[in-house]
Amino acid sequence: MFMGEFHHTIDTKNRLIVPAKFREALGTEFVLTRGMDNCIFGYPLSEWEQLEEKLKQLPLAKKDARAFVRFFYSAAVQCTPDKQGRIMIPQALSTHASLEKECVLIGVSNRIEIWSQEKWASFSEEAEENFDDIAENMLDFDF
């Protein structure tokens, strides 16, 4: 399980340090792809394979299903951290997430997310302001 928030700097070669805590759970190879809210999702291979099985069940006749699968897979890449624990963020993913120098990596249950510091700060501020309303809307999940 992934949890926590870590701040790191992306270097001029688009390399980003993945926190040791996340590397242990991600394994030696994992998958990065476009995420919602203009971030990058990172999945351990086992989670990615489970997600793939679910995506294969989407009806090809539905335009939205085809669009989602294309969008999700087209930017997906397998990553292997180097000896310093860095990964190379492909330009397409970096652009999607508006990554600049300062980045935030967060753990979200079965995946990690990589955010630009600016976008994460904005998202966090809005979520915090609306947390009570969000929690109330989640009552069906019986926290």
UniProtKB/Swiss-Prot annotation:
Family annotation (PROSITE patterns): SPOVT_ABRB
Protein name in the entry: Transcriptional regulator MraZ
Gene Ontology, cellular component aspect: cytoplasm; nucleoid
Subunit structure: Forms oligomers.
Pfam (any one): MraZ
HAMAP family per record: MraZ (MF_01008)
SUPFAM superfamilies documented for this protein: AbrB/MazE/MraZ-like
Residues annotated as domain SpoVT-AbrB: 5-47, 76-119
Major localization listed first in the record, in broad terms: cytoplasm
Coiled coil: none
One GO term (biological process): negative regulation of DNA-templated transcription initiation
Organism for this UniProt entry: Latilactobacillus sakei subsp. sakei (strain 23K)
Family: Belongs to the MraZ family.
